[in-house]
């Protein structure tokens, strides 16, 4: 799993444990997700390409470094992926935002797209796809396949928790897409929930059932 990166920073692991607790309030869960996504953004953007530019400081001219290429795009898999956006925008405030809506067909159990809205000129952009849970991996694989049609420069997938089944599915479909997660949990249950997990991330973010 050389293309899977578990972010084991102590603050990430501490906040993730607080989020897992069943007695964490909606407010606490949402706040912790924002803090976690900010911390994870530093790791995910670690290898972004740089270019040299000439600037003037108050004292002299120097060569500085800035991010190379077009603006980064954060793509949320609706609806839970939206919980990642504010925290990541703390680190990359100039990023563009895209959304993909998918639901699971009850007969085939395969993802079906119902919404797709992206910034213009996606070719050669770097994309970070965000979804708190990588469970079966089917939605993630479908989202990445759809985004590849736009010919971006790179795609990364970021989640809070991953199941081994989801990691295997996404890696098999897209071995070129690195996965960043705070933890890889034990397994999926019969209903497709990650164990031990943290429950339904969307419901816990938005206070719904």
Swiss-Prot record:
GO biological process: UMP salvage; uracil salvage
UniProt note on regulation of activity: Allosterically activated by GTP.
Binding residue positions for uracil: 194, 199-201
Domain of life: Bacteria
InterPro entries per the UniProt record, alphabetical: PRibTrfase_dom (IPR000836), PRTase-like (IPR029057), Upp_B (IPR034332), UPRTase/APRTase (IPR050054), Ura_phspho_trans (IPR005765)
GO molecular function, one term: magnesium ion binding
Reactions it catalyzes: UMP + diphosphate = 5-phospho-alpha-D-ribose 1-diphosphate + uracil
EC number: 2.4.2.9
Pathway stated in the Swiss-Prot or TrEMBL entry: Pyrimidine metabolism; UMP biosynthesis via salvage pathway; UMP from uracil: step 1/1
Enzyme class: transferase
Pfam family, one: UPRTase
Note describing how the cofactor binds: Binds 1 Mg(2+) ion per subunit. The magnesium is bound as Mg-PRPP.
Cofactor: Mg(2+)
Keywords recorded for this protein, A-Z: Allosteric enzyme, Glycosyltransferase, GTP-binding, Magnesium, Nucleotide-binding, Transferase
Binding-site residues, 5-phospho-alpha-D-ribose 1-diphosphate: 79, 104, 131-139, 200
Sequence similarity: Belongs to the UPRTase family.
Function, as annotated: Catalyzes the conversion of uracil and 5-phospho-alpha-D-ribose 1-diphosphate (PRPP) to UMP and diphosphate.
PANTHER family: ADENINE PHOSPHORIBOSYLTRANSFERASE, URACIL PHOSPHORIBOSYLTRANSFERASE, CHLOROPLASTIC
Protein name, per record: Uracil phosphoribosyltransferase
Source species: Acidovorax sp. (strain JS42)
């Amino acid at each position: 799993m050389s293309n899977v990166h578990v972010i084991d920073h102590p603050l990430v692991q501490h906040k993730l444990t607080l989020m897992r607790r069943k007695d964490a309030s909606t407010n606490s869960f949402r706040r912790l997700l924002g803090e976690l996504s900010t911390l994870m953004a530093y790791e995910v953007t670690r290898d972004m390409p740089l270019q040299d530019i000439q600037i003037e400081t108050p004292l002299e001219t120097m060569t500085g470094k800035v991010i190379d290429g077009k603006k980064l795009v954060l793509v949320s898999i609706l609806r839970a992926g939206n919980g990642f956006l504010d925290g990541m925008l703390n680190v990359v405030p100039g990023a563009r935002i895209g959304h993909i809506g998918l639901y699971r067909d009850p007969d085939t159990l395969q993802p079906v797209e119902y919404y797709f809205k992206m910034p213009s000129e996606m070719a050669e952009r770097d994309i970070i796809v965000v979804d708190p849970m990588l469970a079966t991996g089917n939605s993630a694989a479908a989202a990445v396949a759809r985004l590849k049609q736009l010919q971006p420069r790179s795609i990364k997938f970021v989640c809070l928790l991953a199941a081994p089944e989801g990691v295997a599915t996404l890696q098999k479909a897209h071995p070129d897409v690195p996965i960043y997660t705070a933890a890889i949990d034990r397994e999926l249950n019969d209903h497709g929930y990650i164990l031990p997990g943290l429950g339904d991330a969307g419901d816990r973010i938005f206070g719904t059932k």
